Amino acid sequence: TAYHILTKLYLTEMKKKNSGTILNVASIAGFMPGPLMATYYATKAYIVRLSESIREELKKEKSKVQISILCPGPVATNFNKVANVKFHLREADSKKVAKYAIKKMEQGKFYIVPGIDVKIARFGVKLLPTSLVSKISYKMQERKIKK
């Protein structure tokens, strides 16, 4: 994918300089199954796993290059307005999410999860069996489709 290729291209140059930071943008969706939106959830999971793998490689190489993953919930964007996308969680302000991401990235945080409701959702996903998370996700997506 283009995401993978661009990350690797920039990473190669950063590693040569032993300096730099990559901020990959995923989603809370990257931590859970997503029936009825499988492709979206899978692409976000890919970004999470790619970033986790690169992070481990950088650690083993003792590189000073940093990588972070932004994993927000719904973010208010013009795309959502035009596409008439509806969410179950409150949409976060895009500028606030961006500022938060930069602040946490500069602090060296790896997983960047803005918003208490999204942090709670991520914690719940860790605790619950995947089969239950999948059923909950299905119901949430099904309700969105019916709106």
Regions found by a protein language model. Give the residues of each.
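Active-site helix of classical SDR
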Residues: 7, 43
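Active-site-adjacent segment of SDR/Rossmann-fold oxidoreductases
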Residues: 13, 32, 53-65
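Conserved internal alpha-helix in NAD(P)-dependent oxidoreductase domains
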Residues: 1-2, 19-20, 45
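Catalytic tyrosine of NAD(P)H-dependent dehydrogenase/reductases that use a Tyr as the general acid/base
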Residues: 4, 40
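A short helix-coil junction within the Rossmann-fold of NAD(P)-dependent oxidoreductases
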Residues: 9-18
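SDR active-site lid
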Residues: 57-119, 131
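Active-site loop immediately N-terminal to the catalytic Tyr-X3-Lys motif
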Residues: 34-38
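Residue(s) in the substrate-gating loop at a strand-loop-helix junction
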Residues: 27
